[in-house]
Structures are given as C-alpha cells and as structure tokens.
C-alpha cells in the first residue's frame, strides 16, 4: 500500500512532522520532486533535525529514497548524511540514477536570474539553490543525471557539451564576467569533472544509486508500505500554482507516480493526505488575498493589511515563521479556503492533517477567507490566472477563538480533548474539503500530535 503526503498551501505546512507521525508504519519514504530548497524539521526522541534534502523517514531508520523527479545536490546530500551519522544515526538513503544533479553553475545562474526578475516584480522567492536552472536543463535535454556521475566518459561528455553554453549565457546574455564575484570553477569543465566524479565514486562505494521504479516496485511486491513525501505545496506547483510565483516541479499527488516510476494506478489505490497549516504562510512575492501585515520586498505594493501588522508579528513569532533554508520572515495570513478547495480538487485528498492549531490559541477571534469576490462575483476556488487572483478580495468568516491549554495533555487524551471552538474550526475545514481529519498538530514534537486515524 502507498500513502502520499501533500502540502495543500504554499509549503511549510508541517509535512515532515506528519511523515514522522505515520512513519513507523511504513518501510520506505520517498521524495518525488524538489531538491534542497525544501527545508523540513523533524523532532525525534527530543532531538531536532533540520533537513533540506534527506527524506524525513531516514531519521527514524526507514529507507529513504530521492526519486527521479528530484534534483539532487550531492554536496548537500553528503553533508546531511555525515551530520546525521555524527549524531549517532545510520541513515539508509538511495538516489534514483535518473534524478538530475545540481551543479555549481546552476546555483550561480539561479541568483543572476532572480536578480533580473526582481526588477520586474517577477521574482519567485527562490532559495538560490539552483533548483529552477536544473529543471530547465532537464527539460532542455542538457542535464547531468546522477547515473552519469558513475561513468567518467559519460560525465565528461555531458560537461563538455553544457558548460560552454552556461559560460556564454553569463558572459554574452547577462554581460557579466566570470571570476571575482562569479566563481570561475563553476564554469570550468575540469574542476566540475573532478568534483562530481568524486561524488559518483562515493555514491557507488556506498551503494546508494538505484533504478527507482524497479527498486520501489520490488518493495511493493514484497508487501512493504511506501510513503511518498511531497515537498513545497500545491499553490506553488508549476502547473497548478500561482504562476510565475511557483517552484519548478510538481508537488501535487499526481507527480508521485511520475517522479518515482510507480504506476499511477498504484498511487491512486492508496491514500492521499493533505497537510494544512491552520493559518497561511509563505516566503516570496506574489498575491496573497488573506495576508496580515506585510513583509518588505515580498508583499506587493497594493497587498497585505498594514493595519494588522501586530497580529501578523504575533502569529509569525508564535509559529516560528522564518524559512528553514533561508531564514527569511514568512508572510502570514488567515486560512485561505479557496486555495484549499483548489488543492483538494487537484490532489484528491482522502484525509487531512491540520498543523499549528496551537499557534492561534489565545486569540479572541480567528478568521478564515471563506471565498473571494472578483468583479462582483463570488468565487469558491482560486481563479486560473495569477492576475485575476491578485484582484480577488477575501470574504471572511469569523470563529470564536480558543484558549491556550496543555497541548501535550490534549495530544495524549485525543480529539475530544481539544477546545470546543478549535473543534468547530476543524469541523468547518473538513466539511468544506469533504475529507476527514486524520491528525491535528498542536506542537513541534511528534508526541504533540492528536492522531485521529491512520492512513495505513
């Protein structure tokens, strides 16, 4: 059986924590898209682990797989694995040979291109990790795959083909000089060959590379349980998100098949759990109809609600709303129900996990953007174009707040121990999305989760 964990909003919904909660029941945890731009925090036995590439389940002794839909920075991968080993863990991580490798020139170009876009207010809020340029090379059939690192002749041929193109892009299109502020080794075939050939040797020596689809299907044939772990969220999916303020891959559930080599009928027979943050947050630019306050350099000039900056700061501080990878403050807002309805439709949620419910505790009133108004019409889901979305006004519903309680005790006692007003809020979410509540996160630790039902 399979279960797919999907972010229903703009990323950072707490997917890693839910993977951790249900992880004991699975044998393999697979990431099917994204790269080391996807920061996630896992708390295990009181220790906190901040990861950006290694699948969350690897912290709990499960087999972790980076699928062919991922883009992999080998340097980050080995840094994270070494750090986990230094803390006494023995992570078992495999990498799809069809996954594409992030190279230094991808990261350089990511920064250059984001600077150019920022002049036109088109910046996507990239982490600068080279994710977008790597996916561009994948689509342009000029990428370097993990399997290429295992063969010296193939690796050299790939680099000799693509590196001159990257040099020309920097020098002739962006009119920049390689050297000084731009690392010359990032555009040097020999330097790249030596560095990435060494990565290939280590991958080979540690037996880390796999034919992903074959590897996973063998596990399924043996009766193993597999969890697909999505990164980011539905509303920054390159097809279903708020384009162009999106990531470069598909965090939605359909990509679990494409990004791993497991058939869509297999994924479809399993569960799809939508992870919902009890309010809204994001890093990056673009519209956000339910935004509270504003963040310099991210909130559009005509967006946000500056008169509610104190409330925004309270939620941001209580929720620790700062990027795991970048440390940037996240924009925050009330829950956006049209966004969630869109996510439920695009992913086919069979259940929901609502996180950070405790962050809103103590507020007298909690609001939800129930619908939008656009040109005098009510919309219950997101419009298809970002330009229309920017013109949407949120229609709010108000809920009575709930007190701050001993959330650890609530998690021990179960769903009925949640404050009544909090349950009313959760029931509203479940009813609107036509999916039951499987879990409620009321704190950062695994033990601070109210587990209602298991998808496995």
From Swiss-Prot:
EC number per UniProt: 6.3.4.4
Cofactor(s) essential for the protein: Mg(2+)
GO cellular component term of the entry, any: cytoplasm
Cofactor: binding details: Binds 1 Mg(2+) ion per subunit.
Keywords in alphabetical order: Cytoplasm, GTP-binding, Ligase, Magnesium, Metal-binding, Nucleotide-binding, Purine biosynthesis
Organism for this UniProt entry: Natronomonas pharaonis (strain ATCC 35678 / DSM 2160 / CIP 103997 / JCM 8858 / NBRC 14720 / NCIMB 2260 / Gabara) (Halobacterium pharaonis)
Subunit structure of this chain's protein: Homodimer.
Its job: Plays an important role in the de novo pathway of purine nucleotide biosynthesis. Catalyzes the first committed step in the biosynthesis of AMP from IMP.
Origin: domain of life: Archaea
Protein name: Adenylosuccinate synthetase
Cellular localisation: Cytoplasm
Gene Ontology biological process terms in this record: 'de novo' AMP biosynthetic process; IMP metabolic process
Annotated binding of substrate, by residue: 324-330
Chain positions recorded as GTP binding sites: 11-17, 39-41, 330, 356-358, 441-443
Chief location of this protein within or outside the cell: cytoplasm
Binding residues for IMP: 12-15, 37-40, 127, 141, 232, 247, 328
Residues in coiled coil: none
InterPro entries (alphabetical): Adenylosuccin_syn_GTP-bd, Adenylosuccin_syn_Lys_AS, Adenylosuccinate_synth_dom1, Adenylosuccinate_synth_dom2, Adenylosuccinate_synth_dom3, Adenylosuccinate_synthetase, P-loop_NTPase
Pathway: Purine metabolism; AMP biosynthesis via de novo pathway; AMP from IMP: step 1/2
Family that this chain belongs to: Belongs to the adenylosuccinate synthetase family.
Residue positions of the active site: 12 (proton acceptor), 40 (proton donor)
Main EC class the enzyme belongs to: ligase
GO MF annotation: an example: adenylosuccinate synthase activity
Alphabetical list of NCBIfam families matching this protein: PRK01117.1, PRK13785.1, purA
């Amino acid at each position: 059986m399979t279960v797919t964990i999907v972010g229903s909003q703009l990323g950072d919904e707490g997917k890693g924590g839910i993977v951790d909660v249900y992880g004991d029941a699975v044998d393999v945890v697979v990431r099917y898209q994204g790269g080391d731009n996807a920061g996630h925090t896992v708390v295990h036995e009181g220790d906190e682990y901040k990861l950006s590439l290694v699948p969350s389940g690897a912290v709990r002794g499960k087999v972790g797989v980076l699928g062919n839909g991922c883009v992999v920075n080998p340097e980050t991968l080995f840094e994270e694995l070494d750090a986990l080993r230094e803390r006494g863990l023995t992570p078992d991580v495999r990498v799809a040979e069809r996954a594409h490798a992030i190279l230094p020139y991808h990261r350089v170009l990511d920064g250059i291109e984001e600077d150019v876009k920022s002049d036109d207010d088109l910046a996507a809020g990239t982490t600068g990790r080279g994710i977008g340029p790597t996916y561009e090379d994948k689509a342009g059939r000029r990428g370097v795959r993990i399997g290429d690192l295992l063969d010296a002749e193939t690796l050299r041929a790939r680099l000799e083909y693509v590196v001159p193109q990257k040099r020309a892009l920097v020098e002739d299109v962006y009119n920049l000089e390689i050297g000084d502020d731009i690392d010359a080794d990032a555009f040097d075939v020999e330097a790249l060959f030596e560095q990435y050939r060494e990565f290939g040797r280590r991958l080979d020596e540690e037996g880390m590379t796999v034919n992903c689809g074959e590897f996973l299907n063998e596990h399924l044939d043996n009766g193993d349980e597999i969890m697909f772990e999505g990164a980011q969220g539905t509303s920054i999916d390159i097809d279903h998100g708020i384009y162009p303020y999106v990531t470069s891959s598909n965090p939605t559930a359909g990509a679990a098949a494409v990004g791993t080599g497991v058939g869509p009928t297999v994924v479809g027979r399993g569960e799809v759990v939508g992870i919902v943050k009890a309010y809204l947050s994001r890093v990056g630019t673009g519209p956000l109809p339910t935004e509270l306050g504003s963040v310099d350099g991210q909130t559009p000039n005509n967006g946000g609600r500056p008169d509610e900056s104190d409330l925004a700061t309270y939620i941001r501080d209580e929720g620790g709303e700062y990027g795991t990878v970048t440390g940037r403050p996240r924009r925050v807002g009330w829950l956006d129900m049209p966004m969630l309805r869109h996510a439920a439709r695009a992913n086919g949620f069979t259940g929901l996990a609502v996180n950070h419910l405790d962050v809103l505790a103590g507020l007298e009133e909690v609001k939800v953007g129930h619908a939008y108004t656009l040109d005098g019409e009510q919309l219950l889901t997101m419009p298809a174009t970002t330009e229309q979305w920017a013109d949407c006004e949120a229609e709010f519903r108000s809920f009575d707040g709930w007190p701050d309680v001993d959330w650890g005790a609530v998690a021990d006692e179960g769903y009925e121990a949640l404050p009544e007003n909090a349950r009313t809020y959760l029931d509203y979410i479940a009813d609107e999305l036509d999916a039951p509540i499987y879990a409620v996160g009321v704190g950062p630790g695994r033990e601070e989760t109210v587990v209602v039902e298991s998808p496995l």
